[in-house]
A protein has these predicted regions:
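Iron-sulfur cluster-binding electron-transfer modules in prokaryotic oxidoreductases
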Residues: 1-277
Length: 277
């Protein structure tokens, strides 16, 4: 439940500050926020930014970065809002298909119309795009066709991307970690490179996009195997130079951070490089 998640996370944030919770965990961010950064979205807009549940509570700064990038591209943004709730991805991962379908129907009912629905979490994006298959209805298929990863949408609209005014700074090297839900499920991982190109030197891993070990709920159900898979990914990161890592999925980011990697969302790098003058 979104409200329980919000208040539970605030209690965890207090627990972290009191030293009652370990910071080095793949189950939650190293520093949970007590306050959510203020949104600049409007009540009407050209696109809907899907906020979800875990992402909205644990990584709201990514949503704010997405808003900043889209607005800098000349795009007006509105948020999906609390009535939309969870996309149902974790329910589907756990085999709770009926509950996943209920979540999917609620999401669709809360987002009628034709506005593009942009997502900044690869796992959520993959789930939303799968609604046509999950529900098998015309409504679900039409809804899924409205869904795009934020970076995918920007890459499809280069004229918008070109409008973003950037600071004149050096392009630091960053390692791109492709979430499975972006590379294999959505097959739009190249968009991350197009979006990052003007602000960073993209460093590729040599493991051909192998999983980091997070895998949705996989790291909870099979922690030992998950850590072995993560070890392989961390070795690939070391071979690539141990630069800052960018990942477009919260589960991957948390999982790699717990192993010592410095990880941010690609949109955070782009937002940071925007010239606000």
């Amino acid at each position: 439940h979104p409200r329980l998640l919000l208040w539970g996370s605030r209690a965890m944030a207090v627990g972290q500050r009191l030293g009652l919770l370990p910071r080095n965990s793949s189950l939650w961010p190293k520093k949970l926020s007590l306050r959510r950064p203020k949104s600049t979205a409007t009540s009407t807009g050209e696109v809907v930014l899907f906020t979800g549940c875990v992402m909205d509570t644990w990584m709201p700064e990514v949503h704010r970065a997405a808003e900043k990038v889209l607005q800098a591209s000349g795009t007006t943004v509105m948020l999906s809002g609390p009535t939309t709730g969870c996309c149902g991805a974790l329910h589907e991962h756990a085999g709770l298909t009926d509950q996943a379908r209920q979540r999917a129907q609620q999401v669709m009912d809360s987002l009628p119309g034709q506005h593009p629905i942009l997502v900044d979490a690869a796992g959520c994006g993959a789930a939303l795009k799968n609604y046509g298959h999950l529900l098998g209805t015309q409504q679900a298929q039409e809804f899924a066709e409205r869904v795009f990863d934020v970076q995918e949408w920007l890459a499809k609209h280069p004229e918008r991307l070109a409008k973003i005014s950037l600071k004149e700074t050096e392009r630091p090297p960053v390692i791109v970690q492709d979430p499975c839900h972006l590379r294999h499920a959505q097959q739009c991982h190249e968009a991350v490179r197009e979006v990052l190109g003007p602000v960073a030197q993209v460093v590729e891993l040599d493991d051909e996009g192998l999983c980091c070990g997070a895998g949705g709920s996989f790291s909870l159900v099979h922690p030992d195997l998950s850590q072995e898979v993560r070890k392989r990914k961390m070795e690939a990161i070391a071979r690539a130079g141990n630069h800052e890592v960018v990942s477009a999925n919260p589960g991957c980011a948390l999982h790699l951070e717990a192993a010592g990697a410095k990880v941010r969302h690609p949109l955070e790098l782009l937002a940071e490089a925007i010239d606000d003058k």
